[in-house]
């Protein structure tokens, strides 16, 4: 079981530099809880991680090989997973944003993202979900 105040976060992104920035940022965010981070390089790996463990939050890229962020989000909701999702993307496509929001996206975060804004969104999203056991 996770220590009190620990939130499990899954980062799903094929760009290792973004994954590293997000992992480092989660370690620096000042909140009442800490973050345990797992990563996946694409939506298919992310789905496999979600099948193995519950998470408090998913940080998700839009465009990835094998399974896009939109496809992963839709599959999560189809399976009844209510985990909050923040979608980080450099895409300005309103249709993608609308589709993601229709599938229960917590927030659409444009790249490059502001770390202070991301900190607020991460805290709100992670706090909106019931705690999970590690």
Which residue ranges define each predicted feature?
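Two-component/phosphorelay signaling modules centered on CheY-like receiver
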Residues: 16-38
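Conserved phosphotransfer cores of two-component systems
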Residues: 29, 51-53, 75-82, 103
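Acidic catalytic/metal-coordinating carboxylates
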Residues: 42-45, 68-71
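Active-site beta3 strand of CheY-like receiver
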Residues: 53-59
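Receiver (REC) domain active-site loop signature in two-component systems and cognate sites
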Residues: 64
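Alpha4 helix (beta4-alpha4-beta5 surface) of REC/receiver domains from two-component response regulators
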Residues: 71, 92-107
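C-terminal output helix
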Residues: 113-123
């Amino acid at each position: 079981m996770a220590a009190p105040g620990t939130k499990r976060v899954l980062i799903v992104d094929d760009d290792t530099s973004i994954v590293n920035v997000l992992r480092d940022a989660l370690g620096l965010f000042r909140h009442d809880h800490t973050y345990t981070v797992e990563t996946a390089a694409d939506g298919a790996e992310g789905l496999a991680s979600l099948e193995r463990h519950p998470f408090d939050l998913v940080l998700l890229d839009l465009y990835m090989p094998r399974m896009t962020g939109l496809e992963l989000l839709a599959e999560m909701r189809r399976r009844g997973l209510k985990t909050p999702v923040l979608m980080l993307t450099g895409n300005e496509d309103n249709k993608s944003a609308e589709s993601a929001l229709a599938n229960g996206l917590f927030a659409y975060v444009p790249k490059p993202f502001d770390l202070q804004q991301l900190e607020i969104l991460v805290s709100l999203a992670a706090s909106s979900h019931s705690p999970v056991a590690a």
